[in-house]
Structures are given as structure tokens and as C-alpha cells.
Swiss-Prot record:
It comes from Pseudomonas syringae pv. tomato (strain ATCC BAA-871 / DC3000). Its EC number is 6.3.5.5. Gene3D superfamilies: 3.40.50.880, Carbamoyl-phosphate synthase small subunit, N-terminal domain (3.50.30.20). The lineage of its organism: Bacteria, Pseudomonadati, Pseudomonadota, Gammaproteobacteria, Pseudomonadales. Pathway: Amino-acid biosynthesis; L-arginine biosynthesis; carbamoyl phosphate from bicarbonate: step 1/1; Pyrimidine metabolism; UMP biosynthesis via de novo pathway; (S)-dihydroorotate from bicarbonate: step 1/3. The active site is at residues 269, 353, 355. It catalyses: hydrogencarbonate + L-glutamine + 2 ATP + H2O = carbamoyl phosphate + L-glutamate + 2 ADP + phosphate + 2 H(+). L-glutamine binds at residues 47, 241, 243, 270, 273, 311, 313-314. Keywords: Amino-acid biosynthesis, Arginine biosynthesis, ATP-binding, Glutamine amidotransferase, Ligase, Nucleotide-binding, Pyrimidine biosynthesis. This is Carbamoyl phosphate synthase small chain. Residues 1-189 are annotated as: CPSase.
């Protein structure tokens, strides 16, 4: 027997549905994601910390869940909102239904609401703070008050909260269909040593670096640059992550010090924003952000249009780029900046997700550019 649930927005909007996860209450910034697949990757992406994710595709959970599709060791999304949860999950890789997965991970979630109406509200009014209440004891007034009490992501440093607490080495590559596994590659077969700052890194990023010959040392977000440079890395990677980049002063300071060397730097998502801040640019909070796997981005040098995976609520303000920073990618949805490079350093970054997971691989060659930069320095 299903239990009731409600979603309340800070503007007073109420959506009634049914609970499909854990009982209880959760608050966060409500965003919408237009990806048709990849719900498990989305839920386990640390970039979604403190966000309640609305999936616009109407049928979510058709293929169940499997440990191999997780992008981290836990669910980071604050909550989940969907239109319909299928009664049966059917896929040869399925290990657990989405509903059971949500309960097992203590995720408060709601189904059976008009996600089209919700998406229109978020599109027109911008991302809003919200509250999901699920179970027998729910109150519209209390839910609205909880939504309005959430401080919002502006000014919130979440990178240090989701980051690893300990340094570790990563040598697992991308999925191998023949062995049905993520093979671990011997260090002797990995010619490049990359130190990756973990601001909320997705494991598929690490796998794609290993696939291209990198032995990756993953360090906590607050690691000083001196410790990173002591590894004598061939390159430094700045990962994706949640929250507002501007409060991450420890990261900006460290990146500035790395940029004083000749070590190549590559940033993705939050790492892109932090690189821009370290170079002297500014960032801004977006209205409803970019969340999906079908976003067109143009390479400004070649004119080529790529379909990309996106997940960010902040953006680099192109008008604030200093003279030594050049725009190299732009969104064709709203013209916001998607990529930069430093003209006097071997450093570049991309706002979207070249590793996809979920999404297309049109931008994966940026990993190859990073490899080329490290090879040229040798």
C-alpha cells in the first residue's frame, strides 16, 4: 500500500503524489533534468548534493538499478521527483528496483505528480527551494515553511563536504564488455601521472583518464598546492562538484599556485568555474541552470556543434574574462560560456561533462587534449 507525499515550493506551490522512497522530509534546491536515461548516475553524482532532482521524462525506473552504474559510493541528490514509477523493472543488469534502491539509500522521493507543470514553474521562475514530505505525517504549511527556510546554494561551499577525506590512487578503466568489469590497469602500463582534485568527482571521469594512460592520484578538495606539486605530476585535474564556486577560497588559492608552474591543468564543471576564478574571472548564479544530456554546445574555433551532458547552476561570466583567458565553447541554448583556455598557460576547462554518464560522448576528445598537453611537456 502506497503512502502519500507532497512537494512544496518556496512560492507556495503544492504537488500531491505518492511516496516511492523513504519516509520523512528533505529540503533542497529543486531543479529539472531532461535526460531520458541515467537516473542512477544522476542520483549518485555528487554535483547534485543539496538538490531535489525532477526528471522530466515520464517513465523512470524501467531498467532498475545496478552497482556498476553508480558514479560514487552513495546517493547525493537530496530527493527525487518523477511522474511515473513502473511496476516492474526489466533489464538483464537489474539488481534492485528503483523504489527499493531509494528506500535502501534513505532517499525521500515522490511520484505521480504533474512534472510538466513543475518544470514550467522552474523554467519561468528559476530554480526554487523545495521540500518533499513522505509518509503518514505530512503538512502543507510545514513543508512550505521548510522550503522557505532552506538558505539556497548561493554562497554555499559544498565541495569540501562531498570530497574524499583521504588521498587514494585510481587505476580502474572504462567498462570492458568481454570481462564484464572495470579492469584495473597495472601502474607500469600507465605512463602519465595525474593528480585529481576531488570536489565531488564522478568515477567515470577517473576511468576515462585511466583509459588514456593516466595513473590518477585523487586528493581532498582542501589539499594545498604544495602537496599536489610534491607528487611531480604530469598534469592536474580539477573535478566536477556541487554548490557555489566563489566560497571555495582554498581551491582558488591552490589553483593559482598550480598555474604559476608549467603543469597542464584541465577542469570540468565546478573545476571549470574554479579555474576561471583563479584566473581572475567571476561567476554568476543561473536562473534554472543546465541539467540534461541533450545540450548543444559550439566549439568557437571550429564551429562544430556537439551534444553534451550538463549539470550546473552557476556559470562563468564571460564579460569578466581577463585578457589572458579566451572563450572556446558556448551553449547554443542560452549563449552562456561553456569553455575557456588560458593563452599563457597550458590550462583549459569545460563547463559540461565530457565523461557523460549519462549522455553522449561528443566532448570526450577534451580528455585527449589533456593527454596531448602532458605529452608535449615531456
Amino acid at each position: 500500500m502506497t503512502k502519500p507525499a507532497i512537494l512544496a515550493l518556496a512560492d507556495g506551490s503544492i504537488f500531491r503524489g505518492e511516496a516511492i522512497g523513504a519516509d520523512g522530509q528533505t529540503v533542497g534546491e529543486v531543479v529539472f533534468n531532461t535526460a531520458m536515461t541515467g537516473y542512477q548516475e544522476i542520483l549518485t553524482d555528487p554535483s547534485y548534493a543539496q538538490q531535489i532532482v525532477t526528471l522530466t521524462y515520464p517513465h523512470i525506473g524501467n531498467t532498475g538499478t545496478t552497482p556498476e552504474d553508480a558514479e560514487s559510493d552513495r546517493v547525493w541528490s537530496a530527493g527525487l521527483v518523477i511522474r511515473d514509477l513502473p511496476l516492474v523493472a526489466s533489464n538483464w543488469r537489474n539488481k534492485m528496483s528503483l523504489g527499493d534502491y531509494l528506500k535502501a539509500n534513505n532517499v525521500v522521493a515522490i511520484a505521480g505528480i504533474d512534472t510538466r507543470r513543475l518544470t514550467r514553474i522552474l523554467r519561468e521562475k528559476g530554480a526554487q527551494n523545495g521540500c518533499i514530505m513522505a509518509g503518514d505525517n505530512i503538512s502543507e504549511e510545514a513543508a512550505i515553511a521548510a522550503a522557505r527556510g532552506f538558505p539556497g546554494l548561493k554562497g554555499m561551499d559544498l565541495a569540501k563536504e562531498v570530497s574524499t577525506k583521504d588521498t587514494y590512487e585510481w587505476r580502474h578503466s572504462v567498462w570492458n564488455l568481454q570481462t564484464d568489469s572495470h579492469p584495473e590497469i597495472a601502474a607500469s602500463e600507465l605512463p602519465y601521472h595525474v593528480v585529481a582534485y576531488d570536489y565531488g568527482v564522478k568515477v567515470n571521469i577517473l576511468r576515462m583518464l585511466v583509459e588514456r594512460g593516466c595513473r590518477v592520484t585523487v586528493v581532498p578538495a582542501q589539499t594545498p598546492a604544495s602537496e599536489v606539486l610534491a607528487y611531480k605530476p604530469d598534469g592536474v585535474f580539477l573535478s566536477n562538484g556541487p554548490g557555489d564556486p566563489e566560497p571555495c577560497d582554498y581551491a582558488i588559492k591552490a589553483i593559482k599556485q598550480v598555474l604559476e608552474t608549467e603543469v597542464p591543468v584541465f577542469g570540468i564543471c565546478l573545476g571549470h568555474q574554479l579555474l576561471a576564478l583563479a584566473a581572475g574571472a567571476k561567476t554568476v548564479k543561473m536562473g534554472h541552470g543546465h541539467h540534461g544530456a541533450n545540450h548543444p554546445v559550439q566549439d568557437l574555433d571550429t564551429g562544430v556543434v556537439m551534444i553534451t551532458s550538463q549539470n550546473h547552476g552557476f556559470a562563468v561570466d564571460e564579460s569578466t574574462l581577463p585578457g589572458n583567458v579566451r572563450a572556446i565553447h558556448k551553449s547554443l541554448f542560452d549563449g552562456t560560456l561553456q569553455g575557456i583556455e588560458l593563452t599563457d598557460k597550458s590550462a583549459f576547462s569545460f563547463q559540461g561533462h565530457p565523461e557523460a554518464s549519462p549522455g553522449p560522448n561528443d566532448v570526450a576528445p577534451l580528455f585527449d587534449r589533456f593527454i596531448d598537453a602532458m605529452a608535449k611537456r615531456r
